Regions:
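Noncatalytic, solvent-exposed loop/strand surfaces
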Residues: 1-226
Length: 226
């Protein structure tokens, strides 16, 4: 079993039968969610801005990649971490590792959407998702008002990535396998393609706020309200 101890920045490997610790590895920041197993490697991100690959058998570091554009730190929830943290759970799809670095598209230059070789850590591609419409180059808020109606805003917060086999999803934001944001504007409910239905949470899969009720949704997206 591979378990992340979030606030101690440590990943533990446990014997599934006895619970005995086999090895542990400590990073420079929080590990906010479980790691990903892939062909003998344990792959995960950390709030220190790096992606790690450990050998599953002994916890030895195979490679480490800095997903953050620069190694700059800040205080967050009483701990030091990167201005561009990486979620613990990374996505593997068609032998490519996908992850994001950053908190929000509107701060610190946006979110970095990265594609890595999971075996070597080699960078295969990077897309910066920021406050500009990728289709027109306009300010996203102004461009979005032209594409939709009502009190709605595009997805901007980072979250654990999911995949339906055809596209990648960050909350309800559709992203192509080569890192392009797709279908920025809203669609009419009756015209939404059922093939795009997926499980997401509008507040993020990692939201642990006690006083805010959030639900996992199976669909294409949700709209805002007043």
């Amino acid at each position: 079993l591979f378990v992340a101890s979030i606030d101690t920045h440590t990943l533990h490997a446990l014997n599934a039968k006895t619970g005995r610790k086999v090895w542990s590895y400590t990073t420079g920041g929080r590990i906010d969610s479980p790691p990903t197993y892939y062909k003998g490697l344990i792959l995960f991100g950390s709030a220190d801005g790096y992606v790690y690959a450990l050998r599953a058998g002994d916890g030895i570091l195979a490679w480490r990649f800095r997903a953050a554009p620069v190694d700059r730190r800040m205080m967050a929830w009483e701990q030091l971490e990167s201005a561009w943290p990486v979620h613990g759970s990374v996505l593997i799809q068609k032998n490519v590792l996908y992850c994001t670095a950053g908190r929000n598209m509107y701060v610190e230059g946006g979110i970095r959407f990265l594609r890595l070789d999971p075996a070597t850590g080699k960078l295969l591609g990077e897309t910066v998702m920021n406050d500009k419409d990728p289709e027109t180059g306009e300010d996203m808020h102004l461009a979005y008002l032209k594409k939709t109606q009502g009190n709605n805003m595009p997805v901007a917060h980072s979250d654990i990535l999911t995949c339906d086999g055809r596209n990648i999803w960050m909350r309800s934001q559709k992203i192509s396998l080569d890192g392009k944001r797709l279908e920025i504007g809203l669609e009419k409910v009756e015209e939404q393609n059922p093939k795009d239905f997926h499980i997401f949470c509008q507040n993020g899969f990692l939201d642990d706020s006690y006083f805010f009720r959030s639900y996992w949704t199976f669909g294409r997206r949700v709209t805002g309200g007043y």
